[in-house]
Amino acid sequence: MHKILLMQNLVNIHNTLLEQSRKTIRRDLMDEINWDDRLIGIKGFRGVGKTTFLIDIMNEKYVNDKSCLYVNLNNFYFTKRKIISFADEFYKTGGKTLILDQIHKYPDWATELKGCYTNFPDLKIIFSASPVLRVLEENNELKEIAKIYHLEGLSFREYLNYQTNQNFKQYTLQEILTNHINIAQEIVQAVKPLAFFNDYLKDGFYPYFLDNKSYYSETLLKHINLALEIDVTYLNQIDLQYLPKLRKLLQIIASQSPFSPNVSKISAEVQTSRATIMNYLRYMKNARIINLLFSNGNEDEIKKPDMVYMHNTNLMYAIDEGNITSKILRQTFFYNQVGYKNQIKSSDKANFLVNDIYHFNVGGKYTLPFEEGYFAAADMIEVGNANIIPLWLFGFLY
């Protein structure tokens, strides 16, 4: 009887989430997931909207479906109940889709996910996780069965669609490179992208603006600190006494990025070893707090990155607005939007080398390609020409 009541409580929470009126932005990732897979993971930065995305999945694919159940593993119930035991009961009572939020809050999650996959052949599990969780890299039992997707912050396209009630589609990099004039002309006939661009750079990447834009920076700072305290520190088994050093390193990065790191100087300033600084950089990159740029694209654990960038422009405004310049905003935006689905390396002839083929200079309205065959991503132009492409248009890649 007690188990029945607990299960009903979880069902009530599930129903309440579906019934709540809330603002949301439909993410195109919904259409990129292969829903035939039985074990699907959604990773993303703290506060990027993973829980909202899971609720959107329920609303779109499982509304009024009693064989689907959402549970948050932050619930104290799962301190005494194993996932596999719960899934067994759910499965035997007709359950078909189990949505597990915050899988990283549960110990031995990988073994139990594998057990659920093996023991319940008609059960689909969709779970969310911290971006630093090495779901496949450190769990051989999941490599062949789990499909992992990353929920990124809003693209400029998604933000623009919401603000203007449009439905602009995303384009591949190749489509933009070969047809950017026609694409840009079609968009600017409907809206003025540059009228929304600066707002996006400041407070449009994360969905917090949907609820209360006035507290955007405070909300983002809270999630940055939680990411350092939990995603970076706890999940990488770093003692909390070293958290001040992580915070100091992030402040240095935010105040100087993009920059070529002098690891010896930084290690002296943070008062830790060079090897520790390299580890911290990698951890923060995995947490989607910073981006690292390498000449060969190989993020070797012992190789110093050529350049360090903040992951997105909103983080720059939240941590150290005084460091911001137009040049920094432009380059950070380009790396963030293009790098989500394309490989970016440093270039000895331009700012970035994309997919080992395309060299890009990123700058203001008068920016030109370094030489013939190269490209320029130019700010403050609506429509480009030849190999000069509007910077804002690279926000339409996802």
Task: Describe the function of each predicted region.
Residues 65-94:
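Short glycine-rich substrate-engagement loop in P-loop NTPases that contacts/grips substrate
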Residues 1-23, 33, 47, 56, ...:
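A cross-kingdom feature that marks ATP-driven nucleic-acid transaction machinery
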Residues 208-346:
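Accessory nucleic acid-recognition modules appended to NTPase machines
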Residues 42:
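Hydrophobic anchor at the beta1->P-loop junction of P-loop NTPases
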Residues 99, 124-130, 150:
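Structural recognition of the conserved hydrophobic beta-strand(s) that form the central parallel beta-sheet
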Residues 50-51:
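Conserved lysine of the Walker
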Residues 2-16, 130, 136-246:
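Interdomain motor-coupling "hinge/lid" segment immediately C-terminal to the ATP-binding subdomain
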Residues 91-109:
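Conserved P-loop NTPase "ATPase switch" module shared by AAA+ and STAND
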